């Protein structure tokens, strides 16, 4: 699963997910992409589950770009532990997703197959998404 090799600090504040995605909001590498419509968190497991779904659907053809990376650690205290005594250990990694962020891109397969693969992948994700095509200027 995806996670940073090393970080400057082990733990992070919770923070708030506000605003829209300006960077990473256009299809840059492939021809068709999966774009988020709502905000949320995408865990490393969800990124991998969606990637596997796309890979299985398109079989050997085409190329996949994963445009998100889980760089935020989420901590959790064990069950039945009293409050205090510091922040819990890191449990998993997430990527904060803002509306408009491109999550996956595909190229080298038919548009119909790409739409099917991205629709299957979208069902694995905890927020609403849409399929967008690359706009050529």
Swiss-Prot record:
One Pfam annotation reads Ribosomal_L16
Please state which protein family the record places this protein in. Belongs to the universal ribosomal protein uL16 family.
Q: Which InterPro entries match?
A: Ribosomal_uL16 (IPR047873), Ribosomal_uL16_bact-type (IPR000114), Ribosomal_uL16_CS (IPR020798), Ribosomal_uL16_dom (IPR016180), Ribosomal_uL16_sf (IPR036920)
Record keywords: tRNA-binding included?
yes
SUPFAM superfamilies xref list = Ribosomal protein L16p/L10e
Report the GO molecular function annotations.
rRNA binding; structural constituent of ribosome; tRNA binding
Q: Which UniProt keywords apply?
A: Ribonucleoprotein, Ribosomal protein, RNA-binding, rRNA-binding, tRNA-binding
**Gene3D superfamilies the UniProt entry points to:** Ribosomal protein L10e/L16
| Subunit note | Part of the 50S ribosomal subunit.
Give one GO biological process term.
Answer: translation
Q: What highest taxon heads this organism's lineage?
A: Bacteria
Look up keyword Cell membrane and say if it applies. no
Q: Which GO terms describe its cellular component?
A: cytosolic large ribosomal subunit
Protein purpose? Binds 23S rRNA and is also seen to make contacts with the A and possibly P site tRNAs.
Q: What is this protein called?
A: Large ribosomal subunit protein uL16
């Amino acid at each position: 699963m995806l996670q940073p090799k090393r970080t400057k600090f082990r733990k992070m504040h919770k923070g708030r997910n506000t605003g829209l995605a300006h960077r990473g909001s256009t299809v840059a590498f492939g021809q068709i992409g999966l774009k988020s419509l709502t905000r949320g968190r995408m865990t490393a497991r969800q990124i991998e589950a969606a990637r596997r779904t796309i890979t299985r659907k398109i079989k050997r053809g085409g190329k996949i770009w994963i445009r998100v990376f889980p760089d935020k650690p989420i901590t959790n205290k064990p069950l039945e532990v009293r409050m205090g005594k510091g922040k819990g250990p890191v449990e998993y990694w997430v990527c904060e997703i803002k509306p408009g962020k491109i999550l996956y891109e595909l190229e080298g397969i038919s548009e119909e197959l790409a739409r099917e693969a991205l629709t299957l992948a979208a069902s694995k994700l905890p927020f609403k998404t849409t399929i967008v095509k690359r706009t050529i200027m």
